[in-house]
Swiss-Prot record:
Enzyme class: hydrolase
InterPro entries according to UniProt: UppP
Compartment list: Cell membrane
The protein's name in its UniProt record: Undecaprenyl-diphosphatase
Primary localization class, coarse: membrane
GO molecular function (one): undecaprenyl-diphosphatase activity
Keyword Transmembrane assigned: yes
One Gene Ontology biological process: peptidoglycan biosynthetic process
Keywords on record: Antibiotic resistance, Cell membrane, Cell shape, Cell wall biogenesis/degradation, Hydrolase, Membrane, Peptidoglycan synthesis, Transmembrane, Transmembrane helix
Keyword Methyltransferase: no
Amino acid sequence: MIIIEFIKGLILGIVEGLTEFAPVSSTGHMILVDDMWLKSTEFLGPHSAFTFKVVIQLGSVFAAAWVFRERYFEMLHIGKYRNSSINEEFRSKPRRLNLLHVLVGMIPAGILGVLFDDFIEAHLFSVPTVMIGLFLGAIYMIIADKYSKKVQNPKSVDQINYVQAFVIGISQAVAMWPGFSRSGSTISTGVLMKLDHKSASDFTFIMAVPIMLAASALSLVKNYQYIELAHIPFYLIGFLAAFIVGLIAIKTFLHLINKVKLVPFAIYRIVLVIIIAILYFGFGIGQGISG
């Protein structure tokens, strides 16, 4: 039984690492893989299973933080960026992405999270609402890709202004609807703001890390009492799997996104909706899942 639990933890960590920062909705995949198949709540209990998902999400967040560590060091003037000549070089570049861009982008989701986090968790984490989010998010991504073909000179991440950062932040707040996908929503909005796909993805990930760290820390503070010593190895293997797979997935995604764009991910999401709908409405699998 212990080996089976470890395998389940490994699978869930891999799924989290693959999907957290891809525009495909990690929530939708967790419903399909965990709630409909592996059912971690059956051997962890509902509260511990929720805490486990927070822990493995942290693995993905740390992976993104590692990939963009140089950007964060630069914005915070840490390490080699303490050097005045290096700082002067970066400051001299027009509209260099800075910490204020990230903070401005975080404002909408931060406010919405404080006001409605409990409501969203209680009422929107159901299979039908996630399917709606998956489908609408896919349509939004297709629209963004269609628009991007008309943009002649897309902007880089260092050309983002504060208004654009705030608008992209609004789309991050909208993506608190489960299934909509934070990265799918914000990358699409960035593309609509005339950024190229890679730059929109860069800003999405850079902006997402601090707010996801804060949200995860808050969840752990609320639920730390449900972390049992016997479950620590299970949490650890899920965390490490999410971190390692997340590193590979993020680097691969950033390398490919300007070539493949968003439509393939949108089509995948629609297929995922169909699969979940067949299992849910056709076979009754996951009927008991709700917020």
